[in-house]
UniProtKB/Swiss-Prot annotation:
Optimum temperature is 55 degrees Celsius. Changing residue 325 to E: Complete loss of activity. Forms wild-type complexes with HslV and is able to bind ATP. Keywords: ATP-binding, Chaperone, Cytoplasm, Nucleotide-binding, Stress response. Changing residue 80 to T: Some effect on protease activity. GO terms for molecular function: ATP binding; ATP hydrolysis activity; identical protein binding; magnesium ion binding; peptidase activity; proteasome-activating activity; protein domain specific binding. It comes from Escherichia coli (strain K12). This is ATP-dependent protease ATPase subunit HslU. The gene is hslU.
Length: 443
C-alpha cells in the first residue's frame, strides 16, 4: 500500500492533471487515511470506515484521469467501472456484485505479481540449475538415479560463469516446460460470468500439469523457467487470503458516470438500469459480504469514489440513502483558455510532446511556439463555447485537425523543421472555427 503523504500524492497528480486542486486534495486525503487507519489498534481500526467521495463536474475536466492516475499511485487493489453497465438483480445484465468479484480478481493478480517478484532471486537460481542440467547432465549411478554431488564439477562451474556473462544466450537447447493449460472458451448470457469462470477453471485442471519438450535459445528459456519456478514457490491458498485481505482493507472502487443512473422525471414501471442499480449499490457501499470464487469478501472498508457530469440530472436526484453514503462532495471547475494552454505544455506526456515524438520517428522536427499554443487553446475554447462543451477532449480534436497535413506528408518531409505558430494555426483552423456549422461536424 502507498505510504505517500497527501502533499506528495497531489504533487504526483500535478504532473498529469492541470487544475482541479480540490479534487486532488480530497482523493489524496482519502488515500492517506487508508494508511492512517492501518496504524491504529485492531479494535479502533474496525470502527473507522472510509469517507466515500462524489466528484461533480462537466465532461472533459479530469474526473476519469484522476482515477487512472490514482490507480497507479495507490499500490492497492483498484477497479474503475461504468455505472451504466449494470442492471438490477434478476434482470439480464451485469449485477453490481461483479464489481467486487472483478476487484478481487485484480487483487489476486497484483498479489501474485508481488509474490513472484519476491521469489525472483531464488527462481533465477533454480532456473539456472535446470539449464545447467541440460548442458551438463548430472552423473547417474548403476540404477539410473541422479547422484548427489558434494561439490559442483569444474565444467559445471565454467558453464555457470559463461551463462551469467551471457556468452551462451544464443545457444539452442531442448528443455521440458509446463504445457499451457487446456483452453476452453465458454459463451454464456450476461450476468453468468462467475459460472463460466468456474467451469473454465475446472476444465483447465482436468489435464493436470503436463510437461512439454521445447527447443529454445537459452536467453528465452531462462525467462520462461524463471516464471515457472517462481510460480512453484508461491502458495495459492496464502495468495488468495492475502488478496482478500488487500481488497477488504485497501480496496478502492471508482464508479464513473453515476449521474446516468439517476431517475429523470416521473416514470411508471420498474427502472432496472437506474434506480434499481442505485438500490443494489447501497449494501456494497454500506458494507456487506460478497461471494467470489476466491472466498467471501467484506466490503465494509472498501473506499468508493463516484463521479458524474450531472449536466441533466443533479446529485439530489440520487436516492437519499446513496447520497448519505457519499458524504464528501467535490466540484470540479470548467476549464478556461489558460487551463488549455497549460494542458498543452505542462504535463509530462502532453499531447504536443506526443505529436513531436511521433513526427520525430519520420525525421520531422516539430516546434510549437507560445503564440501557436495560445491560438490552439483559444480555438478549442471557442468551439466548446459555440457547440458542445467537451472540455479538454476538444484539444485532441483540434490538434488532430491541425496536424493532419503534416502527418499525411511526414514521410516526404524528413529532415525538415516545421514551426507551428499563431499564423500557422490561424491559416489551418480559423475558417473551421468561424463557421459554426462546419465546426459542429468537423471539430
Amino acid at each position: 500500500m502507498s505510504e505517500m503523504t497527501p502533499r506528495e500524492i497531489v504533487s504526483e497528480l500535478d504532473k498529469h492533471i492541470i487544475g482541479q486542486d480540490n479534487a486532488k486534495r480530497s482523493v489524496a486525503i482519502a488515500l492517506r487515511n487508508r494508511w492512517r487507519r492501518m496504524q491504529l489498534n485492531e479494535e479502533l481500526r474496525h470502527e473507522v470506515t472510509p469517507k466515500n467521495i462524489l466528484m461533480i463536474g462537466p465532461t472533459g475536466v479530469g474526473k476519469t484521469e484522476i482515477a487512472r492516475r490514482l490507480a497507479k499511485l495507490a499500490n492497492a487493489p483498484f477497479i474503475k467501472v461504468e455505472a451504466t453497465k449494470f442492471t438490477e438483480v434478476g434482470y439480464v445484465g451485469k449485477e453490481v456484485d461483479s464489481i467486487i468479484r472483478d476487484l478481487t480478481d485484480a487483487a489476486v493478480k497484483m498479489v501474485r505479481v508481488q509474490a513472484i517478484e519476491k521469489n525472483r532471486y531464488r527462481a533465477e537460481e533454480l532456473a539456472e540449475e535446470r539449464i545447467l542440467d541440460v548442458l551438463i547432465p548430472p552423473a547417474k549411478n548403476n540404477w539410473g538415479q541422479t547422484e548427489q554431488q558434494q561439490e559442483p564439477s569444474a565444467a559445471r562451474q565454467a558453464f555457470r560463469k559463461k551463462l551469467r556473462e551471457g556468452q551462451l544466450d544464443d545457444k539452442e537447447i531442448e528443455i521440458d516446460l509446463a504445457a499451457a493449460p487446456m483452453g476452453v472458451e465458454i459463451m454464456a448470457p450476461p450476468g453468468m460470468e462467475e459460472m463460466t469462470s468456474q467451469l473454465q477453471s475446472m476444465f483447465q485442471n482436468l489435464g493436470g500439469q503436463k510437461q512439454k519438450a521445447r527447443k529454445l535459445k537459452i536467453k528465452d528459456a531462462m525467462k520462461l523457467l524463471i516464471e515457472e519456478e517462481a510460480a512453484k514457490l508461491v502458495n495459492p491458498e496464502e495468495l488468495k487470503q492475502d488478496a482478500i485481505d488487500a481488497v477488504e482493507q485497501h480496496g478502492i472502487v471508482f464508479i464513473d458516470e453515476i449521474d446516468k443512473i439517476c431517475k429523470r422525471g416521473e416514470s411508471s414501471g420498474p427502472d432496472v438500469s437506474r434506480e434499481g442499480v442505485q438500490r443494489d449499490l447501497l449494501p456494497l457501499v454500506e458494507g456487506c459480504t460478497v461471494s467470489t470464487k476466491h472466498g467471501m469478501v467484506k466490503t465494509d472498508h472498501i473506499l468508493f469514489i463516484a463521479s458524474g457530469a450531472f449536466q441533466i440530472a443533479k446529485p439530489s436526484d440520487l436516492i437519499p440513502e446513496l447520497q448519505g453514503r457519499l458524504p464528501i462532495r467535490v466540484e470540479l471547475q470548467a476549464l478556461t483558455t489558460s487551463d488549455f494552454e497549460r494542458i498543452l505544455t505542462e504535463p509530462n506526456a502532453s499531447i504536443t510532446v506526443q505529436y513531436k515524438a511521433l513526427m520525430a520517428t519520420e525525421g520531422v522536427n516539430i516546434e510549437f511556439t507560445d503564440s501557436g499554443i495560445k491560438r490552439i487553446a483559444e480555438a478549442a475554447w471557442q468551439v466548446n463555447e459555440s457547440t458542445e462543451n467537451i472540455g479538454a477532449r476538444r484539444l485532441h480534436t483540434v490538434l488532430e485537425r491541425l496536424m493532419e497535413e503534416i502527418s499525411y506528408d511526414a514521410s516526404d518531409l524528413s529532415g525538415q523543421n516545421i514551426t507551428i505558430d499563431a499564423d500557422y494555426v490561424s491559416k489551418h483552423l480559423d475558417a473551421l472555427v468561424a463557421d459554426e456549422d462546419l465546426s459542429r461536424f468537423i471539430l
